[in-house]
Amino acid sequence: MLVYQELCIDTCAFGVNGESALARKKKIRPQDLKDVRVLCGTYEYMEASFEEMLKDTGAKMQDLHTEYNLESMVQAKFQESLLVFHSHWENCYSHILKVLPSHIIAGSVGVIMRKGEEKRLEDLVNEIQKAV
């Protein structure tokens, strides 16, 4: 039997063209997204879709119907669009886009493992924390 073990709760981050007005902000608030076009990748394994996470912001959501790739980053860089992603993936996008954090909850990050392996995972996490 497999079980899901949550490791942390993540937040949304947004990739933006460094010249855009939003790029001057330190952190994106939900009200900053009103009438702003937000590009959303499709990831079947996510707890909730980006559209669901941002549904109350008034953003103009554009579902890309695929996972992000270079084309989606270029689209955000050269158009007035934001690219939304989990903040833990910031390093994947920061070389092309200015990345802005938010307090918008993106859901949990965790692992799927065999039931009964929780102690082994705890030991692994402790070793990683010591190394960092």
List PLM regions with ranges.
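Alpha-helix boundary recognition
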Residues: 8, 34, 55, 74-78, ...
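Short amphipathic alpha-helical segments and helix-helix/interface helices
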Residues: 4, 30, 50-54, 72-74, ...
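Secondary-structure junction motif
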Residues: 36-58, 121
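Beta-alpha-beta core module
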Residues: 1-5, 10, 71-119
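Flexible hinge/capping segments at coil-to-helix
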Residues: 2-12, 16-38, 122
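Extended ligand-binding regions for polar small-molecule ligands
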Residues: 18, 31-34, 105-132
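Short beta-strand-to-loop elements that line the ligand-binding cleft
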Residues: 40-41, 59-70
